[in-house]
Structure formats: C-alpha cells, structure tokens
C-alpha cells in the first residue's frame, strides 16, 4: 500500500458554536448527515462533537487534493464511530467509486480536541 494523500484540519470550536447559534438547523443540515445531527443532539457538547466532524470532512477533502467540489460534498462524507467508539469515515457510493477510480482504497481518520480546538487528520491509501 502507498499513501495517496494526507489532510489535516483544525477548527475553532467557538466558530461552530456561533454558526449553531446564528443558523441552527439550517447550518446543521447543510454540513452534516441526519445520523451525525442525531448523534450530536444526544451529546452534552454538541458544538465540540460537530466541530470534530467538520474538521474530518475538511481533512478528507484536503487529502484528496480537490477541495469541496463534486463529487466531494458535505453529505458524501459521514463520520461515525465503530463498535469500540473509534471514529471512521463512511462515504457515499458516488464518492466511493470516485476514490476507487483514483486508486484510493482505504481511508484512516484520527480526531482530537483540546479546549477551543478540534483537529482531524485523514490518510488515504491505495496501491
């Protein structure tokens, strides 16, 4: 396997808090999937939870070198947790096919937060 891309993003959590306060569900629905929104609302610190997912989506687009343009769309990238609570990325079928056409077979995600910041790193692998 070879590394096909690396992306990193850092988000100032108060920026997400401000967007939630100003735009509410409009902001949530523009950026996040229904599952992400539902999972966030079950949490005490919704903005922190969503900031980490926002950072993950941005890091993924940076790893591809494309930025946020078709087929990379906010809802095409979903951050969820596996059975052990480890974050992982689920892609839409269109985006998965796009990745496969560019020999990207695996994607790895790490998330962290500290005080007012959330950070994500994404590593893309292929042959």
For each predicted feature, which ranges?
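Core catalytic alpha/beta fold that binds nucleotide/phospho-ligands
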Residues: 1-127
């Amino acid at each position: 396997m070879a590394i096909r891309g690396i992306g990193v993003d850092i988000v100032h959590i108060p920026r997400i808090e401000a967007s939630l306060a100003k735009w509410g569900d409009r902001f949530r629905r523009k950026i996040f999937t229904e599952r992400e929104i539902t999972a966030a609302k079950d949490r005490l610190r919704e903005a922190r939870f969503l900031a980490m997912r926002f950072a993950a989506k941005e890091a993924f687009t940076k790893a591809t070198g494309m930025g946020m343009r078709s087929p990379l769309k906010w809802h095409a990238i979903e951050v969820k947790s596996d059975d052990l609570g480890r974050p992982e990325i689920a892609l839409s079928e269109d985006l998965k096919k796009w990745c496969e056409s560019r020999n990207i077979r695996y994607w790895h995600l790490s998330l962290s937060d500290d005080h007012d910041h959330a950070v994500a790193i994404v590593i893309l692998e292929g042959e």
